[in-house]
Swiss-Prot record:
The lineage of its organism: Bacteria, Pseudomonadati, Chlorobiota, Chlorobiia, Chlorobiales. NCBIfam families: PRK05327.1, rpsD_bact. This is Small ribosomal subunit protein uS4. Belongs to the universal ribosomal protein uS4 family. Transmembrane segments: none annotated. It holds the Pfam family Ribosomal_S4. One of its GO terms (cellular component) is small ribosomal subunit. PANTHER family: 30S 40S RIBOSOMAL PROTEIN, SMALL RIBOSOMAL SUBUNIT PROTEIN US4M. Part of the 30S ribosomal subunit. Contacts protein S5. The interaction surface between S4 and S5 is involved in control of translational fidelity.
Length: 203
């Protein structure tokens, strides 16, 4: 699947959210949109622009392109419950996201690379599809030849236990994690309003 190849830092500044550790540091120094008039842009933002911005936040945060994001939305609509909540839950179940949440990678982008390069298994079987949706009880583990990679060990050492969510059980020493449950919406702390995305797609 094609991936975004532009500047994540510029996108982060435009959307006002940190999409990577590097972007987070950059935003601390330059917390405004890129470009000559980034600091002085003012004026009322239209409802459509707000909805579009929230969709962009979700897409870039989870590393999902438009066609797949729309597919998640259609699936969320078909499920019982609140569509926006369902959408967030689907994105949180992605393999690359759970790898990131487990502390095995410093960003979702880095987690995606670990997955696509075949470093991880699910229930003992190699899975290299970032969009694979985990179900409760599934075990994520590094393949034997991939254990103790420097980047992974460094990320685990830097990841405080408080950052690892309650719906994932992580064994740092053995570099494995169990996806315990699908998180409730209120357990997912991300800077977006998915209801605006639902309104956008509902038009």
């Amino acid at each position: 699947m094609a991936r975004f190849r532009g500047s994540i830092t510029k996108v982060s500044r435009r959307l006002g959210i940190a999409l990577s550790p590097k972007a987070e540091k950059y935003l601390e120094r330059r917390p405004f949109a890129p470009g000559q008039h980034g600091q002085s842009r003012k004026g009322k933002i239209s409802e459509y622009a707000l909805q579009l911005r929230e969709k962009q936040k979700m897409k870039y945060l989870y590393g999902v392109l438009e066609n797949q994001f729309r597919s998640y939305y259609r699936k969320a609509v078909s499920q019982r419950g609140v569509t926006g909540d369902n959408l967030v839950k689907l994105l949180e179940r992605r393999f690359d996201n759970v790898v990131f949440r487990s502390g095995f990678a410093a960003s979702r982008s880095a987690a995606r690379q670990l997955v696509t390069h075949g470093h991880l298994t699910i229930n003992g079987k190699k899975v290299n599809i970032p969009s694979y949706l985990l179900t409760p009880g599934e075990l994520i583990e590094f393949r034997q030849k991939s254990k103790n990679m420097g980047a992974v060990t460094d990320s685990l050492n830097k990841a405080p236990d408080a950052r690892i969510p309650s719906w994932i059980q992580v064994d740092k020493a053995n570099q494995k994690a169990v996806f315990l449950s699908v998180p409730e919406r209120e357990e997912v702390q991300e800077p977006f309003n998915e209801q605006l995305v639902v309104e956008l797609y509902s038009k």
